[in-house]
Amino acid sequence: IHYSITDAGGDSPNVVQPRAQVLYMVRSIWVKDALELQERVDRIALAASMMTDTKMEKKFIDGCSNTVPNKVLESLMWENFNDLGVCHYTEEELKYAKALYDSVEMKSADLPGDAAKDSDEIYEFVDEKSKHGTVPINEFLVPYLYSEKPRMGSTDVGDVSWCVPTAQINTSTFPAQAPGHSWQNVSCGRTSIAHKNMLLAGKVIAATAIDLMEKPEVLQAAKDEFNKKMKRYGGYICPIPKDAVPVVLGEKM
């Protein structure tokens, strides 16, 4: 549970303000668990208002689901990625990536990429290619490894994956060791490093789409895998209430 007090009601520390506003973000590995936790948070807020004889109002902002992987589509995307090859960089781009890499004061001891944590073979591969995690930006493709292990993050692609077979890839749009949500990541957004990797991702997606149109048996296999998982997981539960309306973040209630 994350929270931010967006409006304390006033500046005076010795006064009980007439109103206050707080933003909560409730997260879990499975969307159904997040929704149950959200209901509990709502009940706690209501109970607190009853204890203080105040009025509680709530406004839903947004929500997204966990992502359901599809091995058939992921394998196909990896094959196309492997055929197209990874991006390579100019001396100027490598110099820029190195400067950002060096600016990260607290570097992680982990190797780049989640898969290195799940497979000894991939760990050794990444360790060699990244020179023990010291390469500023990666220029290699990690071997494919199917995994249902949860990865932390939030994306509306998760909701799509509950409705149709879905797969994703990652390209090197920012330097290694740059923490998520960091200024180092943001600093790469308008660079040629990010642009060429975005174009590469588009090519991989396009090539995969062509394969699915030309190979209906592969598309059917992806659908079969999707249907089996939906039967196992119980189908899609939309985290957004039917009466929800768009909200401007930070807007006073």
For every predicted segment, state its role.
Residues 64-253:
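An extended, acidic, His-containing surface patch that forms the Zn2+-binding/catalytic region
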